[in-house]
Amino acid sequence: MYESTTTQLENILANISSEKQMEEFMEHPKVTDSFHSFPKYFESLESVQTLGSGELIKRSSLERSYYYQIMKGTRSPGRDKVLRLCLAAGLTLRETTRALELSGNAPLYPKNRRDIILTVAINQKAGVIDANLLLSKYGEEPLA
């Protein structure tokens, strides 16, 4: 199923000037947040689908059973576990922020030293091991 990107929707919205057009736009099925949970959002991402569960488990160093419990929604992952999965999947900062929000965890904070390092690791498309090495290099706790 094709999902409109936010940018595409913003471009359409920029040209709407009447209430009738606005109402038609809001009725459009793509103008909803179809993701109310972390697992549904995470599994919908192209990079996650491309890698597959086995590779994500390997790259994130999560226990296989824990990973599947997260994806089934029977376990709620902590912030570091979500970050491990996002790094393993090579998600963008925007995708990672959304994943953190949907999982009920705090987004990366630009005034927090550890979060700054993690943001740079995400921007560099670093894996979990490289992110942990970067954290350790600057005296911060590695991802749990």
Question: PLM features: what roles do these ranges have?
Answer:
Residues S61-P77, L102-G104:
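Recognition helix of helix-turn-helix/homeodomain-like DNA-binding domains
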Residues A88-A89, R113-P142:
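Long, compositionally biased
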